[in-house]
């Protein structure tokens, strides 16, 4: 029998035991994606990197089209390739920085060309550094995101507030923030929290979906556009045909302007 998506199969079998399941995965794309993951796993193994994962999703519906939870080529079982790292919490690194940027743009706390400080910083013994150990003095906010600078983002988080940022992340679909804001502190923006590829892919897909529909809805928003990915064929909902549809609102978690500026920097 075909075994093209073993990690997804194991996940769904555990979540829905004994059920007959139809997924949204496309077999040809699944095989291509898994082959790509396996190829890079072999290439990176010389650097002791043995675990990789990838998701391909339809932004419009959130349907998962390919789900490669880990490398599947024959390998030492001690490397953990049987573990589905799509759903396994990992350090978020710098991947939350665009959400902070968008949140500050939305709230009027920042403009793309506003200068932010990149000088040595110490917060109760926590001294962040940029990846290249260099400080740039003052940089435009959009440059701080493009270069993924650490020090300016820590300053931005201090201004925005950690608890407020956690609420924003949760509202976009992050489910792994289980501790208090005091627990994470300023390190939240530099990987101090764990996230899953599943959540984060859904969050970025939602950002793209909201922005894509902004013109369609003539400057209004549909809260239902913010939702997680699904491994099943998406429910086909009645399309919105009128700008007075009760499902639309003028309020947004993040405005289209904030989303446009943010996504244009990371080329989504």
Model feature map: region roles:
Residues 1-3, 7, 14-90, 94-95, ...:
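Periplasmic/cell-envelope proteins involved in peptidoglycan metabolism and beta-lactam response
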Residues 2-13, 60, 110-165, 209, ...:
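Conserved catalytic neighborhood of penicillin-recognizing serine enzymes
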Residues 21, 25, 49-54, 116-121, ...:
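Active-site-adjacent helix/loop patches that line small-molecule binding or acyl-intermediate pockets
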Residues 23-43, 56-58, 67, 75-85, ...:
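A penicillin-recognizing enzyme superfamily signal
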Residues 30, 93-98, 138, 146, ...:
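Short alpha-helical patches at coil-to-helix transitions and adjacent helical residues
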Residues 33, 62, 95-104, 144, ...:
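Residue-level preference for non-acidic, small/hydrophobic
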Residues 39, 103-108, 159, 206-210:
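Active-site catalytic microenvironments for nucleophilic, acid-base chemistry
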Residues 69, 100, 104-105, 170, ...:
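Hydrophobic alpha-helix feature that most strongly marks membrane-spanning transmembrane helices
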């Amino acid at each position: 029998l075909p075994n093209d998506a073993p990690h997804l199969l194991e996940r769904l079998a555990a979540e829905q035991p004994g059920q007959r399941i139809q997924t949204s995965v496309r077999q040809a794309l699944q095989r291509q994606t898994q082959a790509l993951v396996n190829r890079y796993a072999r290439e990176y193994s010389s650097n002791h990197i043995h675990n990789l994962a990838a998701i391909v999703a339809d932004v419009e519906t959130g349907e998962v089209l390919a789900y490669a939870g880990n490398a599947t080529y024959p390998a030492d079982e001690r490397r953990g390739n049987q573990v589905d790292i799509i759903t396994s919490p990992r350090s978020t690194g710098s991947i939350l920085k665009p959400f902070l940027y968008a949140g500050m743009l939305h709230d009027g706390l920042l403009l793309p060309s506003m200068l932010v400080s990149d000088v040595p910083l110490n917060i109760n013994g926590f001294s962040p550094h940029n990846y290249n150990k260099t400080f740039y003095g003052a940089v435009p906010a959009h440059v701080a995101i493009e270069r993924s600078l650490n020090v300016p983002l820590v300053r931005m988080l201090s201004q925005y507030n950690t608890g407020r940022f956690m609420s924003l992340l949760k509202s976009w679909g992050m489910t792994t923030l289980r501790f208090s804001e005091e627990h994470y502190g300023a390190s939240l923006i530099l990987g101090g929290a764990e996230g899953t590829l599943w959540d984060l892919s859904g969050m970025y897909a939602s950002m793209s979906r909201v922005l894509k529909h902004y013109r369609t809805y003539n400057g209004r928003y549909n809260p239902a556009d913010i939702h997680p990915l699904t491994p099943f064929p998406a429910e086909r909902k009645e399309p919105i045909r009128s700008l007075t549809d009760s499902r639309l609102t003028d309020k947004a978690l993040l405005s289209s302007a904030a989303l446009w500026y943010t996504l244009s920097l990371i080329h989504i």
